[in-house]
């Protein structure tokens, strides 16, 4: 029996649609596999280019634990990829920013002296604004898939990262005390001032613009102003003095009763930890909640020491790795950063007996004590422009 023409046409069209659907699925799958193959081939080329390169990594050099960790990473990179890692120890990464600005001004767009920088905040914003960074590159790293995307990795002190820097770890400003000598440490900056007045010469903080010192005064300003909304906006000459007035009033009082009368300050977290261990200070400061464990393991702190955050929480941020636009070892830099994001490298970095730096990977990819690193309630950083303004004013008032 002959079917109606329109019915035959409908069956014919259904076959065509079905066939096209299968073809589209096959084509889509082929595209995915082709993209993956291209991506793999591209990364293989980068690894081949990286072999034999020397990577100059500009990073803070004020921690024995961090320095030893980078020595381990250097051995792994040499053995596994043929990449030589040179840790260029800097006191303040702003020195590296100045170097890169000079190279930019001189038209040195290749064969630069810096291959990787460890940065965040104001230094990232400065490098980004002056087009000093290579990228975006982060999502092309094979180990990017392990990164915990629930972390605020797409912003750095409110500045969009736009793939120009890869997250490396999580920082939180906390204090360390010895439970045997100070059972109930101050839980706020208000209590800290009262403690210093009751027990003069026992408290201090690193001298700004050292990172920990600047973080101390930012955290103090947030508490004193009840986290004034102006701090989340670019700093303004119109409101700077008004917003920061409580900060300088507090520090004027604090310095009078601080260690050495506020005339001298620890150079950084390492010295504050040493002064705590020597019994000269009752509190040390760190941006790593777990550094107390590695310091205990290396004999730098007593087993009775403990890290804690103030009652309101801890100033918190992500720290990042970036590649300058003119890096001489660009391929080697990408391979290095990719390795530092591997579960192996992040697990070792997070090991409480090695560095204890909280990882940026999802915990399911971590092993050992890195899976259980301690984190406190977080307080957001102010807008990065406040950092430079606060440091300048601090130096003007107390720098001599």
Where are these regions (language model features)?
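Bacterial N-terminal signal peptides that target proteins for export
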Residues: 10-20
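Short, polar/charged alpha-helical segment
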Residues: 42-51, 58, 63-84, 175
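Mature extracytoplasmic/periplasmic domains
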Residues: 314-381
């Amino acid at each position: 029996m002959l079917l109606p023409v329109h019915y035959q046409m409908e069956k014919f069209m259904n076959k065509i649609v079905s066939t096209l659907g299968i073809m589209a699925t096959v084509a889509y799958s082929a595209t995915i596999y082709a993209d993956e193959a291209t991506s793999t081939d591209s990364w293989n080329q980068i690894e081949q280019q990286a072999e034999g390169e020397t990577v100059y990594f500009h990073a803070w050099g004020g921690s024995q634990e961090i320095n030893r960790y980078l020595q381990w990473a250097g051995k792994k990179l040499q053995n596994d990829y043929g990449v030589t890692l040179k840790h260029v120890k800097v006191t303040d990464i702003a020195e590296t920013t100045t170097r890169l600005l000079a190279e930019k001004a001189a038209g040195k767009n290749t064969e630069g002296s810096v291959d990787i920088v460890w940065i965040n905040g104001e230094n990232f914003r400065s490098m980004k604004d002056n087009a000093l960074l290579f990228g975006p590159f982060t999502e092309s790293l094979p180990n990017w898939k392990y990164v915990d995307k629930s972390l605020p990795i797409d912003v750095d002190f409110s500045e969009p990262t736009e793939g120009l820097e890869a997250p490396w770890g999580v920082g939180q400003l906390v204090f360390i005390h010895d439970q045997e000598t100070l059972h109930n440490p101050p839980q706020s900056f208000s209590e800290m001032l009262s403690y210093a007045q009751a027990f003069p010469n026992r408290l201090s903080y690193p001298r700004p613009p050292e990172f920990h010192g600047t973080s101390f005064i930012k955290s103090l300003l947030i508490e004193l102003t009840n986290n004034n909304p102006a701090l989340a906006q670019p700093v303004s000459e119109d409101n700077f003095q008004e917003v920061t007035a409580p900060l300088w009033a507090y520090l004027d009082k604090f310095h009078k009763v601080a260690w050495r009368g506020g005339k001298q300050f620890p150079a950084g977290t390492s010295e504050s930890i040493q002064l705590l261990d020597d019994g000269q200070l009752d509190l040390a400061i760190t941006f790593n909640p777990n550094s107390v464990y590695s310091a205990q393991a290396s004999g730098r702190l007593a087993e009775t020491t403990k890290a804690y955050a103030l009652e309101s929480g801890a100033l918190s941020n992500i720290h990042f790795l970036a590649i300058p636009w003119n890096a001489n070892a660009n391929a080697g830099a990408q391979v290095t950063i990719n390795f530092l994001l591997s579960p192996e490298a992040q697990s070792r970095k997070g090991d409480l007996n090695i560095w204890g730096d909280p990882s940026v990977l999802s915990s399911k990819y971590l092993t050992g004590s890195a899976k259980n690193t301690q984190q406190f309630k977080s307080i957001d950083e102010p807008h990065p422009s406040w950092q430079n303004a606060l440091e300048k004013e601090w130096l003007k008032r107390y720098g001599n």
